[in-house]
């Protein structure tokens, strides 16, 4: 019996796909641990208002950065696939350079918008004098932020998978961690947001240098220009719509909380959201692992095999997430108290967010199924519907219920998106995405 188990374990570990998946999972878990360690440091050493400003600017970069990127970070892999089997590094480099130029122009337009915008508009909406200057500074470094995100996905396209995962999950936190520690030592905590922005400038420069280094490692032969700028945008933007919608869905609650409850509430709520991301990382990692298998089996019309894959992934996701969900639901105060007694204010929001994410876990591969089976536009419509619901619920609930309202809005829209996808797939393909 033990020999049989040992044989299967060794066979599994020796599989290159499994080894890559395990290494990716290990790096991502380490990244989550690093993020939570840094969050603990911030909540212990910095005033909640400063932490709230940090999370507010970070959310702005995520949401608006996804728009400035126009989906290039996702479509770079698509263009590499389009070039296969007659793959040329030179062609991919030309695509990359055009993407960088268009990212720069989009970032420049954003910066000019804030230069020309009357500061009183932002001041009146958020009811304070600091928000405009925070957003202005963030828009000034948007190009470097977008460049860092794009470069990491270029690493993946160049098959530097480990480097890509390290930057995406670990290295991107190191500059801000170092700067945040130094600010505490120098008693300059007020400059936390500036440190965050400088860290993205640093990451943008470093990843660009590495990108050109990886391009020069191989011979780049390119005699023609494969894709025009117009074609790049045409192919990239539809791919990005669902991603942008999801980022915005994770931003509306922060924006409305800042408007109605201030930066401290943003800090408290952001901790609850980060705890919820523990569950989403598990779901995302497993779905990334099975997405290629879903695409291949569906393409070959092996519907029974697709059903088996999605059911196995659903069982695995639930098996791993359920203990974490139960733990967070039973001990929310114990967990939040690690971040400081003030953060207990997010207890109700945490419970709702965890319940919502736990419910979504039962839908397994819903986040990737439609994209992997050629129904990207259907998925976009579902996610855009969820985004509209998210905005309406945040608009109506946060003024009255604060953090709890934001948690209800996010959980309801996430459940709508997963349930809508599962319902469509069952109706069209006869595939049960939900655990059964």
What are these regions (language model features)?
Residues 20-39, 168, 172, 195-215, ...:
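Transmembrane helical elements of multi-pass membrane transporters/channels
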Residues 15-77, 115, 237-263, 386, ...:
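Signature of the first transmembrane helix
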Residues 2-17, 186-196, 208-250, 293, ...:
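Interhelical loop/hinge segments that connect adjacent transmembrane helices in multipass membrane
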Residues 20-31, 57, 69-119, 303-324:
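Membrane-water interface segments that mark the loop-to-transmembrane alpha-helix transition
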Residues 167-217, 385-389, 403-427:
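Hydrophobic alpha-helical transmembrane segments
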Residues 144-167, 354-382, 425:
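Membrane-interface junctions at transmembrane-helix termini in multi-pass inner-membrane proteins
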């Amino acid at each position: 019996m033990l020999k049989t188990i040992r044989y299967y374990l060794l066979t599994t570990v020796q599989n290159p796909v499994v080894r890559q998946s395990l290494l990716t999972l290990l790096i991502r878990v380490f990244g989550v641990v690093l993020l939570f360690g840094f969050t603990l440091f911030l909540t212990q050493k910095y005033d909640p208002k400063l932490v709230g400003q940090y999370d507010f600017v970070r959310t702005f970069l995520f949401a608006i950065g996804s728009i400035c990127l126009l989906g290039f970070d996702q479509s770079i892999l698509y263009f590499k696939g389009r070039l296969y089997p007659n793959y040329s590094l030179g062609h991919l480099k030309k695509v990359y350079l055009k993407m960088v130029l268009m990212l720069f122009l989009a970032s420049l337009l954003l910066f000019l918008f804030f230069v020309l915008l009357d500061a009183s508009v932002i001041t009146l909406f958020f009811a304070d004098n600091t928000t405009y200057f925070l957003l202005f500074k963030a828009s000034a470094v948007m190009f470097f932020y977008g460049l860092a995100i794009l470069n990491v996905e270029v690493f993946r396209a160049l098959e530097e998978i480990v480097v890509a995962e390290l930057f995406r999950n670990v290295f991107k936190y190191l500059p801000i961690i170092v700067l945040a520690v130094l600010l505490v030592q120098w008693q300059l905590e007020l400059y936390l947001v500036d440190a965050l922005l400088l860290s993205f400038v640093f990451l943008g420069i470093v990843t660009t240098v590495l990108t050109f280094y990886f391009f020069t490692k191989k011979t780049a032969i390119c005699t023609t220009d494969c894709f025009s700028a117009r074609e790049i945008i045409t192919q990239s933007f539809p791919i990005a719509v669902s991603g942008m919608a999801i980022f915005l869905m994770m931003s509306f609650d922060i924006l409305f909380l800042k408007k109605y409850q201030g930066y401290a509430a943003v800090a408290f709520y952001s901790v609850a959201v980060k705890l919820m991301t523990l569950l989403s990382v598990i779901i995302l990692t497993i779905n990334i692992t099975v997405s290629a298998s879903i695409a291949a089996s569906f393409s070959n019309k092996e519907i029974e095999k697709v059903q088996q894959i999605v059911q196995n992934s659903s069982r695995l996701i639930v098996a791993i997430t359920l203990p974490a969900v139960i733990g967070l639901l039973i001990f929310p105060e114990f967990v939040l108290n690690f971040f400081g007694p003030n953060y207990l204010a997010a207890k109700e929001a945490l419970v709702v967010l965890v319940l919502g994410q736990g419910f979504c876990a039962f839908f397994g591969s819903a986040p990737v199924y439609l994209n992997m089976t050629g129904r990207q536009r259907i998925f976009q419509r579902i996610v855009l519907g969820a985004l509209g619901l998210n905005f309406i619920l945040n608009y109506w609930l946060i003024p009255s219920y604060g953090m709890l309202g934001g948690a209800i809005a996010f959980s309801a829209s996430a459940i709508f998106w997963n349930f809508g996808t599962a319902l469509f797939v069952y109706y069209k393909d006869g595939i049960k995405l939900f655990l059964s």
